[in-house]
Amino acid sequence: MTNANNMARYGVGFDYRDGEGQDWIGSWHRPDISSPNGERHGSSGVCLTSDGDIVLVGGDNIPWEFPDGRPEGEEDWWATLEGEVFEVSCSSVEEATLRGFIRIECVRLPQKGLVRIRSLWEAMVSVHPWVPQHEITRRLVVPSYEALERVEFGRVLGPIYRRWFHEATGYVDTNPL
């Protein structure tokens, strides 16, 4: 669930350090304007089943997360979403709505100035038999109210993920974090 007081607002940046020690500023961007400038870094989906449950994926050393992936060649945002959701969760995207973008900019060497953009979607999916591939070795289908409790997205970028989850599901938690 999400807390209205802890959701990202348009264009407001959040400082964070990634697992490789790089310092970044991440921000939420609305879908009703063109995507922010930067390197296309993939698509992610809050994937809902016809029952309203949510598909999560993970690996041996990968915590639960929403299905996502990077583009191959010149794929557009939609093609990346569709292909990666199938590859990592064995689910077919039936329809999808763009809910926003996350923009991250590296603010310290050696990658200072690098800007990456990821599209964030709400996707209605059909779940197929599980055939794990690559680094994704686990899939879990959970009620929507459990999804954010299981996904590890870090405290700093949490407001962006909560905004995306709210935009995709409509859930708002009135309890503070």
Question: Where do the model's predicted regions map?
Answer:
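Conserved Nudix-box catalytic region and its N-terminal flanking loop in Nudix hydrolases
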Residues: L48-S91
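Nudix hydrolase/Nudix homology domain
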Residues: W130-L177
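Acidic, metal-coordinating catalytic segment for phosphate/diphosphate chemistry
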Residues: T2-S44
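Class I (Rossmann-like) S-adenosyl-L-methionine-dependent methyltransferase catalytic domain
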Residues: G26-H29, S34-S35, E105-R108, V115, ...
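Conserved hydrophobic/aromatic beta-strand scaffold that supports enzyme active sites
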Residues: V46, L120-E122, R139
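Acidic surface patches and DE-rich sequence motifs
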Residues: Y16-G19, T49, G59, L109
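Active-site-adjacent beta-strand/loop module that shapes the phosphate/pyrophosphate-binding cleft
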Residues: I102-P129
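A short coil-to-beta-strand element that immediately follows conserved catalytic motifs
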Residues: S92-F101
